[in-house]
């Protein structure tokens, strides 16, 4: 039965295990929600605004089905966009987006209809009636979200995180420090960003010393607002020792507008990653490394719509073990590190790294891998090579608030099924299985990030 009680559960032990974890609170240490939207607590106007307006997963699949861009990110009305989505939605079968959006519809709206061209109008009208009462804060409480960490630039004032402490009841909203723009000396707009950091924190950031002072002040500012983790997007990690004088010379050259060599770019990035590690060591923050996303690969899309519009891809040819060796040994036992990889063929590398370094944790299946298929493969491999018990937990990685419940439910069902299979095969006693799924679903990630 579609999305029935046994959805994704193929054995009796799995059903029993899922029933024990399905109602646990959600702790999400990595997502892309905007704290401002949660604090302002305005209801959505329509189902497209909820499900399609910010979701590049939806945009990509609509494009794959031949839908014109004006019905995706263009000037058409939200209703026209929803109808265009519903028309092609049956083609999404097998992709987790098909299940997530149906789960949202069934669990949150209690509308048990299959999305199609025939049902699109009814769903539009029924959700329209219910949305005025479904404010962001109410939904977060209904989904039992206990803690969530947004992703924020070091220049941020964190004004809405501060307001959330008083305005948002029952949910803790924390920032995550994401200093990618500080490190990416080769990107357009780097100097303007560095100047902005100087203005924000009262430092002369034309010099490396001033820029590092500004970053330290930002780090402290985030700490004061409850931050527990940093996050770093690395296409290919390449961290090694770089003398501070070398980094200082590169910084000044880049700030003056001179073109850098590739070696200078690499040296600057390596130096900055080590500085970020030192900052996190001071505050005992978790360092999250998201590895292997080749961003803005489709040029026309990036030029038209900018980043995060559905033009990013996964790439295989990365030297992760070599590139992280210095960083991991420099902070061996000193820094909690979580590794996420986009290409599943890199899972053996990060799993064995975690096995070698007790302070390193394998992150949840990420992005293109957070489907039932990808999660099952990830969990089974991790259990066989490292410790499933030590998985860093589920993250939604979502820009869409409504998907917290559906993404977490899917993960907990797959986890319960994987562990349930082990019970059925006689590999694990039921008592240990119950403790394992509870730990991975809630206790473990809460202790790692927030303990």
From Swiss-Prot:
PANTHER family: URONATE ISOMERASE. GO terms for biological process: D-galacturonate catabolic process; D-glucuronate catabolic process. Homotrimer. Pathway: Carbohydrate metabolism; pentose and glucuronate interconversion. This is Uronate isomerase. It comes from Thermotoga maritima (strain ATCC 43589 / DSM 3109 / JCM 10099 / NBRC 100826 / MSB8). Belongs to the metallo-dependent hydrolases superfamily. Uronate isomerase family. It is an enzyme of class 5 (isomerase). The keyword Transferase does not apply. It comes from the Bacteria. It catalyses: D-glucuronate = D-fructuronate; aldehydo-D-galacturonate = keto-D-tagaturonate. The keyword Isomerase applies. Keywords: Isomerase.
């Amino acid at each position: 039965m579609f999305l029935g009680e046994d959805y994704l559960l193929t054995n009796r032990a799995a059903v029993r295990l899922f029933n024990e974890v399905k109602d646990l609170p959600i702790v999400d240490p990595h997502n892309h929600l905007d704290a401002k939207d949660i604090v302002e607590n305005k209801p959505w106007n329509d189902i497209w605004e909820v499900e399609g307006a910010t979701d590049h997963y939806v945009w990509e699949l609509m494009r794959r089905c031949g839908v014109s861009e004006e019905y995706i990110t263009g000037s058409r009305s939200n209703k026209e966009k929803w109808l265009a989505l519903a028309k092609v939605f049956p083609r999404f079968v097998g992709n987790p987006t098909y299940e997530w959006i149906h789960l949202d519809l069934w669990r949150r709206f209690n509308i048990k209809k299959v999305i199609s061209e025939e049902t699109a109008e009814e769903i539009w009208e029924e959700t329209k009636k219910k949305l005025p009462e479904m404010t962001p804060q109410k939904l977060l409480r209904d989904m039992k979200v206990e803690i969530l960490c947004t992703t924020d630039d070091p220049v941020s004032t964190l004004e809405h995180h501060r307001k959330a402490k008083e305005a948002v009841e029952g949910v803790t909203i924390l920032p995550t420090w994401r200093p990618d723009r500080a490190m990416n000396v080769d990107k357009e707009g780097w100097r303007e960003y560095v100047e902005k950091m100087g203005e924000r924190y009262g430092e002369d950031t034309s010099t490396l010393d001033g820029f590092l002072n500004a970053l330290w002040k930002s780090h402290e500012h985030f700490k004061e607002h409850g931050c527990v983790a940093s996050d770093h997007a690395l296409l290919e990690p390449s961290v090694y020792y770089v003398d501070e004088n070398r980094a200082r010379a590169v910084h000044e050259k880049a700030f003056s507008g001179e073109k850098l060599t590739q070696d200078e770019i690499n040296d600057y990035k390596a130096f900055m990653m080590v500085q970020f590690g030192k900052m996190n060591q001071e505050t005992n923050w978790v360092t999250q490394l998201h590895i292997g996303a080749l961003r803005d690969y489709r040029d026309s899309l990036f030029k038209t719509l900018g980043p995060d519009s559905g033009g990013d891809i996964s790439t295989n040819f990365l030297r992760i073990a070599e590139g992280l060796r210095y960083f991991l040994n420099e902070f061996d036992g000193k820094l909690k590190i979580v590794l996420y990889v986009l290409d599943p063929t890199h899972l053996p590398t990060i799993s064995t790294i975690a096995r070698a370094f007790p302070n390193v944790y394998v992150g949840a299946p990420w992005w293109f891998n957070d489907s039932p298929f990808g999660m099952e493969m990830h969990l089974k491999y991790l259990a066989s090579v490292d410790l499933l018990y030590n998985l860093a937990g589920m993250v939604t990685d979502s820009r869409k608030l409504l998907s917290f419940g559906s993404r977490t439910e899917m993960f907990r069902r797959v986890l319960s099924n994987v562990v349930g299979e082990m019970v059925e095969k006689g590999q694990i006693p039921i008592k240990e299985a119950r403790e394992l799924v509870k730990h991975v679903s809630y206790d473990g990630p809460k202790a790692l990030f927030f303990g």
